[in-house]
């Protein structure tokens, strides 16, 4: 059975009636506003974003997840819209191991150039013990209108540790390989590291560093984001957190440089038992909760 049909069968299985168990739902939603200044230009880019991530634990080892994101970028003349939707299904064993499947779709729409859609699907495996979580994935992607005979292969691994008081750290490595008959493979590599630390009285510091490298044209994109969030429930009855993040992105293509500085404001609402101290869509979040393609990870971490 191919990964595509494994994804479909898992999603269909989630709709079937199951015995009444101790089901647990959690999630978070983040509404974001950003201002980006790009070097050597007179215009700023305004970004409005909405991210949501939700999980359902059936209480019998089965867990399902939903990841949604959309953002509109406007420089005063042209608009760009990016969107993402992903579903996951996994089964956790009593020894801490897990196996699962995923299906994702990323879409980019740019004024004057039309749109492009990428669909990804594959398998996941993980192991969790004493605050440490190691996961890996392997899958394939399809992009609209690509010539036949071109294949996109995705694989990667991530590590996250929350075993010490008030802190969380994570590491993410991914590669997407484009291969075609008679041509040399093209690799897009992503490496990220991130963490967060809960301070006193509802304050949390978070930060992430992500780098993407495309070997065929010697292109590198480096993004650094640092921020702080505040839990409004410490001072009000609102179950929400506000955040401020400063992001610096640097692009180097064959020796030509460009950079951009972004200031992001966020309002995050936690659902169930999930924390909203690290806002969804932040650089730290893209490393701590990575997607399953180096292409989509790069698209959503830079701005």
PLM features per residue range, with description:
Residues 1-23:
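Gram-negative bacterial Sec-dependent N-terminal signal peptides
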Residues 22-76, 125, 166, 262, ...:
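Short glycine/proline- and aromatic-enriched beta-strand/turn motifs that initiate or cap beta-hairpins
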Residues 25-27, 58-66, 94-101, 131-136, ...:
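Repeated loop/turn-to-beta-strand initiation elements of outer-membrane beta-barrel proteins
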Residues 31-39, 68-74, 103-109, 117-119, ...:
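Transmembrane beta-strands of outer-membrane beta-barrel pores
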Residues 44-50, 79-85, 115-121, 149-155, ...:
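Residues that define the transmembrane beta-barrel architecture of outer-membrane proteins
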Residues 50-56, 87-91, 123-127, 157-161, ...:
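Residues on the lipid-exposed face of transmembrane beta-strands in outer-membrane beta-barrel proteins
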Residues 80-177:
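Outer-membrane pore/translocation modules
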Residues 183, 214-217, 231-257, 261-303:
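Flexible, glycine-rich linker and terminal segments associated
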């Amino acid at each position: 059975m191919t990964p595509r049909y494994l994804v479909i069968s898992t999603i269909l299985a989630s709709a079937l009636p199951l015995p009444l168990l101790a089901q647990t739902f959690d999630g978070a939603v983040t509404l974001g506003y950003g201002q980006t200044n790009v070097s050597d230009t007179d215009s700023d880019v305004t970004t409005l974003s909405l991210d949501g991530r939700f999980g359902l634990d059936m209480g019998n080892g089965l867990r399902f997840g939903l990841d949604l994101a959309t953002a509109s970028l406007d420089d005063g003349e042209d608009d760009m819209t990016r969107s993402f939707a992903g579903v996951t299904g996994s089964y956790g064993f009593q020894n801490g191991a897990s196996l699962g499947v995923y299906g994702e779709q990323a879409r980019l729409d740019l004024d004057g150039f039309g749109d492009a859609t990428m669909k990804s699907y594959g398998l996941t495996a993980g192991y969790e013990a004493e605050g440490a979580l190691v996961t890996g994935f392997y899958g394939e992607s399809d992009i609209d209108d690509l010539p036949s005979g071109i294949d996109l292969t995705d694989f990667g691994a991530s590590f996250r540790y929350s075993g010490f008081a008030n802190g969380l750290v994570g590491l993410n490595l991914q590669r997407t390989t484009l291969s075609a008959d008679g041509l040399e493979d093209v690799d897009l590599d992503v490496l990220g590291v991130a963490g967060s630390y809960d301070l006193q009285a509802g304050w949390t510091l978070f930060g992430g560093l992500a780098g993407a490298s495309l070997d065929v044209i010697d292109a590198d994109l480096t993004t650094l984001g640092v921020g702080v969030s505040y839990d409004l429930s410490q001072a009000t009855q609102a179950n929400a957190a506000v955040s401020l993040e400063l992001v610096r992105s640097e692009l180097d293509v064959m020796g030509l440089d460009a950079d951009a500085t972004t200031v992001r404001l966020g309002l995050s609402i936690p659902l169930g038992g999930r924390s909203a101290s690290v806002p969804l869509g932040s650089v730290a979040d893209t490393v701590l909760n990575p997607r399953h393609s180096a292409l989509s990870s790069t698209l959503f971490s830079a701005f």
